[in-house]
Amino acid sequence: MSIDVEPTGRPRVLVVGGKPKLVRKARELGLDVVHAQYPDAYDRVHWPHVDQALLLDYGDMDRFLPLARALHEVYPFQSAVALFELGLLPAARINEELGLNGESVETVELLLDKWRMRQRLAEKGISPMASAIGRSAQDVRDFVKAHGLPIIVKPVRESGSVGVFRVDDEAGVEAVAGRYRSLDDEQWAVGDLFSADSFDEFLMEEYLDGPEISVETLSFDGRHVVCAITDKAAFGGGSGFVELGLSQPSRHPEETLDEVRRLVADFLDAVGLRNGPGHTEIRLTSRGPRIIESHNRIGGYGVNEMVETAYGVDMERYTLGVRFGLVEPLASAPEPLGGVALQALTPEPGRVVEVNGVDAVRADPAFVDLHVKVKPGDVVNPLTWNEDIGGYVIARGADATEAIAHSKRLAAAIHVRTEPVA
């Protein structure tokens, strides 16, 4: 590989996947940027912030790794970074293969593979939960016979609430394996799924009662700092697991949150996460907090913008900057500056005719951010996973309660009119 480049003396990062704002923030920190991205996800908005681009399916490591190695030889980068689910393992593989700084492949694999994560927690005696791998309706029957109803059936790998089902009765027991297999027939886009065989087997777990929260962390050489605890206020969709409302700071009792903080620190130690972001989902059950799953990335939707609004911490900037010595690690958990809430936009399924109210929402004093995913001509699908929402609005308030009210008000002001698809 021959590339004519002028040395800049700046540290250089390989950013694997993710949104344009990540390469922009890398550039703002003073980094040279190499960007690996799907060809159809790379356009002129990236150009001012990217020095070299590798446009390919970066999940195909047989192609990606040789190209990254060859580029590294003539245009060396100090670390590969990913904050998008499907980029986490490729980034870790490249760092390991090239001897660069980053989280271990073992840690990333533990967090991506929910069954391996459960086994590790069982070994450590952390967050006990009945679970097993299934491949057939008989496996579901056997698990229910051993542990009772309700249960949760979900992919071993995947995120965004795709393929998550709650089974409440015998009819559900008989149907869930078939529903799961039918996911193979869906038309998934590149970047939707971790792998083509994601639905060959599933994870069965006992159902956890109680409200759900997520814990947003940054780790610095094994020291875990809780940046925020996010309340998940509303769920919806056919599965009942599509996240529709989020808020910070958490409104749960401080005694409960202290227990959560201790659990998350023990969990991150158990999986070996030493540096960078974490997004750990937890149920506050009648038996105490229990781990649902975790990721070595920042939470999806607008969680980074929420943490920055409520606590003044840009987790993306810390993820990039601390690794290269451009940002000082957080000394302690930040104190809240106010409240913030996110409300999903859930237009009626059908073809989008018009979208109104955007300008008025952006001008509102409570406005923080708005992401409308649909435009006239697009088709809105029924809610089955997080990617089916029509977008979201984020609002601020004096506290979480006020922010929730503002977010609902602003979401209601966005009018997405649809018509039936012929």
Which positions does each model-derived feature cover?
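ATP-binding N-terminal substructure of ATP-dependent carboxylate-amine bond-forming enzymes
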Residues: M1-T107, L112, Q138, G325, ...
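A conserved helix-loop-beta module that forms one wall/lid of the active-site cleft
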Residues: E97-G163, G178, S182-G191
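Conserved ATP-binding module of the ATP-grasp superfamily
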Residues: P128-M129, P150-V153, E170-D209, L244, ...
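ATP-dependent carboxylate/phosphate-activation module, predominantly the ATP-grasp catalytic core
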Residues: A171, F199, E206-L273, P277, ...
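A common structural junction motif
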Residues: S182-D185, R362-A366, L410-P420
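Flexible, glycine/charged-enriched surface loops at secondary-structure junctions
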Residues: A189-D192, N275-T280, L330-P334, R417-A422
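A structural supersecondary motif
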Residues: G278, V361-V379
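A glycine-rich beta-turn/hairpin centered on an aromatic-Pro dipeptide
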Residues: V327-A366
